[in-house]
From Swiss-Prot:
One of its GO terms (molecular function) is amino acid binding. GO terms for biological process: arginine biosynthetic process via ornithine; citrulline biosynthetic process; L-arginine biosynthetic process. It comes from Mycolicibacterium paratuberculosis (strain ATCC BAA-968 / K-10). Its EC number is 2.1.3.3. Carbamoyl phosphate binds at S51, T52, R53, T54, Q78, R102, H129, P130, C131, Q132, C265, L266, R293. GO terms for cellular component: cytoplasm. It comes from the Bacteria. Pfam families: OTCace, OTCace_N. Keywords: Amino-acid biosynthesis, Arginine biosynthesis, Cytoplasm, Transferase. Belongs to the aspartate/ornithine carbamoyltransferase superfamily. OTCase family. It is found in: Cytoplasm. This is Ornithine carbamoyltransferase.
Amino acid sequence: MTPRHFLRDDDLSPAEQAEVLALAAELKKDPFSARPLEGPRGVAVLFDKNSTRTRFSFEVGIAQLGGHAVVVDARSTQLGRDETLEDTARVLSRYVEAIVWRTFEQQRLEAMAGAATVPVINALSDEFHPCQMLADLQAIAEHKGSLSGLRMCYLGDGANNMAHSLMLGGVTAGIHVTIAAPDGFTPAPEFVAAARRRAESTGATVTLTTDARAAARGVDVLVTDTWTSMGQEDDGLDRRTPFWPYQLNADLVSLADPEAIVLHCLPAHRGEEITDEVMDGPSSVVWDEAENRLHAQKALLTWLLERQS
């Protein structure tokens, strides 16, 4: 049987995304109600990039599902060096029930998935952060109810993985997504096109703008992320100057709907992309969002493994 993979947000149809989110809500209420990895059965969790939330949430989640996480960093494997990714995928598929990988280029994940006979999950790539988006959607649903028809605004680096996932995952849920970013930091055109194609089937929309204030006006959800993503620290680009107008602060929050919520996938650079006042304020659901990485990823693993068996 060909495995189902989760490499980007639109790998799930709208109905499938809703199934995963419903299961995530159930698992949050009863963490041990699903045990698809009882045995324990193994899951490979591979890291080319450092992580806090991803590592803890996957390790704890796999244990709660009855399994054992085999956690390996890039220094400890031959991934893409002395052995091809395809050969590694074939071997790991004989050992584990799924492969979770936090890496750089999206094509590395695609190469792994192309040869694997077990599900491959994108735990973050340069292009997408789909597990985080599931957690975001779960948090939004908890605080806003139905997702369809909500208005969500992302402020900051529109070219980063969270902006891409917010577009694809958001419109899959029927959310109207606006990306507010300065010139030179807009989303990749191919991902904008993919999001708009998906939006045609859900009634959602994708809007791109350079006007942060106009983008924030009246929205239900405000989202931001770091201005400098992992691996960009030494690229020499001046990000603070163009991004200051996109800082998520009390002024921008005041433009949104009075019941609007604020999301940040963390880690946050307080005083840069988000102020302390907003991060710790009444609109923030950041900690619920972070917790939901555990529940959403457990639901995703369970859903994928059910289809594998």
